Regions:
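Short hydrophobic/aromatic beta-strand element in the GNAT-like acyltransferase core
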Residues: 178
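Short loop/turn motifs at secondary-structure junctions
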Residues: 9, 38, 90-92
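Active-site loop signature of alpha/beta-hydrolase-fold enzymes
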Residues: 2-3, 21, 50
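A short acidic, Gly/Pro-enriched loop at the edge of an enzyme's catalytic core
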Residues: 1-13
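Acidic carboxylate diad motif detector
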Residues: 44-46
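A short SAM/SAH-binding and catalytic strip from SAM-dependent methyltransferases
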Residues: 11-26
Length: 186
């Protein structure tokens, strides 16, 4: 979070699904603010829980916990918390929207994780494909060809993928919360 660069040395900064890994949003956004020249822009794709997320629903909470565990995330904020963090360090928030919620003839963002259709890529994401992968890794671990722990990593990633699919279907999570912000001109 501490970039070795002079203050006000960037004309623009963007982040695509990267700042979601920062446990302290104001700190990371503050560092971006420090680096930007006055009037410069910041574009962000952020993970966040949507307005449909119900913190009182045990099913929603389990999905969120699986997303955090599988994604290695300490927190997944809601959009209001993210917007507040940007404003708290001085940004003007020019535009925000959940690009995953846009209507139109598109494939849902989580569809590649479902494993539907007939292709090598979809087989890999299918229930059978994940079973084959885990059992192949088990055999490779037993033969000491793959390092110990590969199955555990695979299972954690599969847990996250399943949680992303369920969260996407329910509309309680988006990996595509778009923010366009600006450092005020002096």
């Amino acid at each position: 979070q501490n970039v070795d660069a002079q203050d006000e040395s960037f004309d623009a900064v963007y982040s695509i699904e990267a700042t979601c890994c920062a446990p302290d949003k104001p700190s990371i956004y503050g560092e971006v603010f420090r680096l930007l020249k006055p009037g410069a822009r910041f574009g962000v794709y952020e993970y966040c829980m949507t307005d449909r997320f119900d913190a009182g629903d045990p099913h929603h909470l389990r999905i969120k916990a699986d997303l955090q565990l599988g994604g290695g995330l300490l927190v997944i904020d809601d959009r209001q918390t993210i917007d507040h963090a940007l404003r708290s360090v001085g940004f003007e928030v020019l535009e925000t929207r959940d690009l995953a919620a846009q209507t139109g003839p598109s494939i849902p963002w989580y569809q590649p994780l479902v494993g539907s259709g007939i292709s090598l890529a979809s087989f890999r994401s299918s229930r059978i494909g994940r079973w084959v992968t885990n059992n192949t890794l088990r055999a490779l671990e037993a033969l000491r060809i793959a390092p110990q722990g590969m199955v555990a990593v695979s299972e954690t990633l599969n847990l996250c993928a399943a949680a992303m699919v369920e969260a996407g279907r329910l509309g309680i999570f988006t990996p595509m919360y778009f923010i366009h912000a600006r450092k005020p001109a002096e």
